[in-house]
Structure formats: structure tokens, C-alpha cells
From Swiss-Prot:
Hydrolase as UniProt keyword: yes
SUPFAM superfamilies in UniProt: ITPase-like
Compartments where found: Cytoplasm
HAMAP family: Maf
Cofactor: a divalent metal cation
Listed name of the protein: 7-methyl-GTP pyrophosphatase
Function, in words: Nucleoside triphosphate pyrophosphatase that hydrolyzes 7-methyl-GTP (m(7)GTP). May have a dual role in cell division arrest and in preventing the incorporation of modified nucleotides into cellular nucleic acids.
Amino acid sequence: MTQIILASTSAYRRMLLEKLRLPFICAAPNTDETPRMNENAEQLVMRLAQAKAQALQTKYSQHLIIGSDQVCVINGEITGKPHSFEHAFKQLRQASGHCVTFYTGISLFNSKTGITDTRCELFNVYFRELADDEIRAYLTAENPLNCAGSFKSEGLGITLFERLEGKDPNTLIGLPLITLTELLIRQGVNPLTAIG
């Protein structure tokens, strides 16, 4: 079986990929994530997912390399990780009572053949109306400053929502496993038959 590389240092993506029970290693892609002018959310995450996967091709020349990127769109504005309490508070205040759409790009690059397959998965999060004290309490309790959208849906963040809509709940955490499984099977790696 071709060795798998996850082009990410994200603990969340690593934990998600472990669900497939395939051996893999993680490597930092060191990719410039600056958005381009007039680039929409879908174009941005697909470009960055592919760039992350291909960034490691010299070091890993006979591998399947997975790249992923995620942004959220709140009221038509592309946002990413808040990195500060103030930005996180602003993001959650903007999301309050609205639908926030997460765009997650996933790319599988076969560095041996040069074949790349890149997709974008959408996931909608409908927030309930949030009071400022609820937002402060949540941010203090969970400190989600390294998470797109300023929450962790796998934790206390679930209390912020009215409902969730999407094909794969793993997409919201950063790695759409249903789509990734499809891409892996197309490259000859089936997680079910690889269990051994």
C-alpha cells in the first residue's frame, strides 16, 4: 500500500484521519495561505488544499498526500481562525441568529503519478440567538482561538447551535472523511480492505 501523508499539523485533522485506521504520518506543508484578490471561499480552500498536498511532493515522492483547508463565511464575509478573544467574540456575535457556511477543501495528491483530485465540501451551521454573556462564557470555557468560526462543535460549541446541515459531520471539524474515502478508493486504497 502506498504510504499516506497528512499535510497538516492540526491535531483535529490527525484525530479524524485516525478513524480510517490507515497508517499515515503528519508533515507541515508550510504553505502561504494569503487569499488572492477576488477569490471566493470555494476557490480559496480548493487552491490551498491542493497547494498543501503538493508542497510536500519533493520530500515524499512516492506517496498519497492529503491536503485540507477550511474557512467559514459569516454574512458573506470569509473568516478563518480568530487567534484572539476579541476576534472570536466578534465572529460569534456576527454568527448569532444566522447561518454560517463552512467551506472545506480536500485534496489527494499522488506524488508518484502526479494525479491530484480536489473537492470542496460545504457544511451549514445555524446559530441560535446568543447573548453577549453566553459568548463570553463559551469562549472562556473552551478557548477556541485556533478554530475557524470560533467554536469546537465536538465540544461545548454544540450548545451554540439550532441545527447543523451537511453530508459529513467530520467536514465541520476540518476533514471530510466520506469524500476522502472516495478519493482514496479511486487511488486504490480502501480503508476497509486495508484493515489487517
